[in-house]
Curated annotation (Swiss-Prot):
Pathway: Amino-acid degradation; L-histidine degradation into L-glutamate; L-glutamate from N-formimidoyl-L-glutamate (hydrolase route): step 1/1. This is Formimidoylglutamase. The lineage of its organism: Bacteria, Bacillati, Actinomycetota, Actinomycetes, Mycobacteriales. Mn(2+) 1 binds at residues 127, 151, 155, 239. Catalyzes the conversion of N-formimidoyl-L-glutamate to L-glutamate and formamide. It comes from Corynebacterium efficiens (strain DSM 44549 / YS-314 / AJ 12310 / JCM 11189 / NBRC 100395). Mn(2+) 2 binds at residues 151, 153, 239, 241.
Amino acid sequence: MENETFGTELPDTWVGRIDGDNPEHALWYTTVSPLPEPDEVEEGVVTLGFASDEGNLRNHGTAGAALGPDAIRGVLGLVAVHDARPRYDAGTIRVGGDLERGHDELSDAVETIARAGHLPIVLGGGHEAGFGSHRGIYRARGSSPAIINLDAHLDLRAAERPTNGTPFRQVRELVGEEFRYSVLGVSVPNNTDFLFNAAREFGTEVTTDDEINAMSPQEAADHALALVRDAEHIHLTVDIDVLSEALAPGTGSPAAVGVELGRIRAICTGLAATGRLTLVDVVEVNPRLDHNNQTARVAARLIHEIAEAHLKAT
């Protein structure tokens, strides 16, 4: 595993164009900065790559999500920026076959970023990122943030080794009774009774894809906000397979139905606008399965809107 975090140069997958030197020409590509010393710069948002296929492979899935962080950066760089708040990139953790070490590196990086007052935005990579990132914020904050998981799957599997299906069972084992977990967009046919029983045992709030799709975007956002109304801090984790395969084909476990994008956008920006986000993951983007970077573009749009709303609120 090659650690490429907290360097003095940006990853070379940040690409774009330069239309001019004035702020009115700003793009992510022209505004994002490397982050060698997180505690010596103005507070902002920090993208951090977690290039991991190992969780998918252990779960008998398809490789390719390790390419997700670079694919997301490649399209996020072209997105226009309409504020002067700082955006940083802390590099990429490249996992290889040692997921446990990857989790350690991710937890350490997230803790460092959060202690310096920034919002970490983890780019995946498999959803195994959710455990490593949450453990890092748990250490930084001294408590476990409420988790909102936008996902077709409950991710509460029991397994001998961590996979992309076990992250939130691992979080439950870590934080115990502090565990506060809500999953929105669940596909009932893609989760066994064992998983639903685990969700009930752990007090998980479950909202299905059909239930979210029956709401307006504003109702969906209000529903998510109600779940964390009294939470001081929020961990928003977005598995791109919460969306329909027609919109997000580049993922290892695509959804036949999925949640309509407008509702996911409303939930993400509604949560970000509270100013209480403490951690964000956007995961399971697999460029090998994508069409013309379609899924990476959707992920980049969500990341941009989350960052913009959070920076405006803080």
